């Protein structure tokens, strides 16, 4: 797969930097977040480097990755209790690594999403 020289996630995928691997196949790789925001916080990334969801990721790759999410949730013990998936894109999203990834969060009862200065939109 194509990798970016300066990408942290590409270095984790290649084994250049060690990580706690949760799942791997020909298309994607899952590992635990080093700064978890929930008891379970695993990242699922494509092995080929794409900056974000707007970077022309083939539908086959996205579809495969979404089909892997329940497997990762099962491996992490949150498939039955429930989990949240998040994909951040662009500057306002608080994304910190420019390599597309799906956050899989669980292990705790979650509330609504909250945002900086958020207001619920009224109809």
PLM region spans:
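HIT superfamily nucleotide-processing domains
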Residues: 1-123
């Amino acid at each position: 797969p194509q990798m970016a020289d300066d990408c942290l996630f590409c270095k984790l995928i290649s084994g250049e930097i060690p990580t706690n691997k949760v799942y791997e196949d020909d298309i994607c790789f899952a590992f635990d977040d080093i700064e978890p925001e929930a008891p379970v916080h695993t990242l699922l990334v494509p092995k080929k480097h794409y900056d974000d969801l707007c970077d022309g990721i083939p539908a086959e790759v996205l579809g495969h990755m979404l089909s892997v999410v329940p497997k990762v949730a099962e491996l992490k013990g949150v498939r039955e209790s429930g989990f949240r998936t998040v994909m951040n894109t662009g500057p306002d999203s608080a994304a910190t690594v420019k390599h597309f990834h799906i956050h899989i969060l669980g292990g705790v009862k979650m509330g609504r999403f909250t945002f900086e200065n958020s207001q619920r939109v009224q109809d």
